[in-house]
Amino acid sequence: MRPLLGLLLVFAGCTFALYLLSTRLPRGRRLGSTEEAGGRSLWFPSDLAELRELSEVLREYRKEHQAYVFLLFCGAYLYKQGFAIPGSSFLNVLAGALFGPWLGLLLCCVLTSVGATCCYLLSSIFGKQLVVSYFPDKVALLQRKVEENRNSLFFFLLFLRLFPMTPNWFLNLSAPILNIPIVQFFFSVLIGLIPYNFICVQTGSILSTLTSLDALFSWDTVFKLLAIAMVALIPGTLIKKFSQKHLQLNETSTANHIHSRKDT
C-alpha cells in the first residue's frame, strides 16, 4: 500500500507542477492572456487536428518566449515518458514542427531516454510488486528471454526497441524487475528508438511546412516521406541480422507480438 501511495503522491506533484508550468505563461501579444494559454490550446493533443492547432499556437508564442516553450515541451515530454502515458508520438511530431528536423530529433532522443529512465526508477522504487501482480505472464516471458540473452543483453534490448515483443512502456516498467542495468537501459533507449523518433520528427517537420491538405499528397511530400522510411529501416535491418546470428529468439513469440503498439 505504501508504494502505491508514494507513487500517487509523486504523480500528483508532477501533475500540479506541469499544470502550473502550462498556466503561468509569460504574457505576450502572440498568445493573449494566461487564461487563453492555459485552456484547450495548451493541452496534450489527441489527434492530428489538435496537434496542428497546438503547433501553430506554440510556434507563434515561441517567437517571443523561446526558452519557455522549450521548458514547457521538455516538461510535458518527461511527464508522459516518466509515467508511461501513451501518446509520445504526437509530441515527437510536434518537436519536428517546433524545433526543426535535426534539433527536434536530438531533443526527442534525449528526452525519450531520460523519461524512460525516470519510468525505470519509479518502477524500481514504487512499482515492482504492482507490475508483477498485474502482468505475471508478460514479466515471466521477458525474464526468460533476458536470461537467455544475458551475454548479449545490450543488443537484445536494441532488438526489443526496434522489433517490440511487448510495448515500450511495459519494457520501461519491467526493466528493473528483470535486473537490467540502468546504464545499458538508458543507451538502448537512446539508440534503439532513433529510427522511430526520426520518422515522427521528420514527418512533423514536413507537415509544418504544408499550407493545405492537398499539399500532403503532392509527389514531393510523398517522396520525402518514403525516403525517411527507407533511412529509418537501415538500423533495424542491421540489428535484425545480428540478432538472428547471436540472440536466442523464439520466432513464434516474436511474430505474435511484433505488432504491439510502439508507445514510449
Swiss-Prot record:
Membrane topology, as annotated: Multi-pass membrane protein
Membrane-crossing segments per the record: 67-87, 100-122, 153-173, 175-195, 219-239
InterPro entries reported in the protein's UniProt record: TM41A/B, VTT_dom
Localization per record: Membrane
Domain of life: Eukaryota
Chief localisation class: membrane
Glycoprotein among keywords: yes
Transcription as UniProt keyword: no
GO terms under cellular component: membrane
Region of interest: VTT domain: 96-207
Keywords, alphabetical: Glycoprotein, Membrane, Signal, Transmembrane, Transmembrane helix
Glycan attachment points: 250
Family classification: Belongs to the TMEM41 family.
UniProt remark on domains: The VTT domain was previously called the SNARE-assoc domain. As there is no evidence that this domain associates with SNARE proteins, it was renamed as VMP1, TMEM41, and TVP38 (VTT) domain.
PANTHER family linked: PTHR43220, TRANSMEMBRANE PROTEIN 41A (PTHR43220:SF21)
The protein's name in its UniProt record: Transmembrane protein 41A
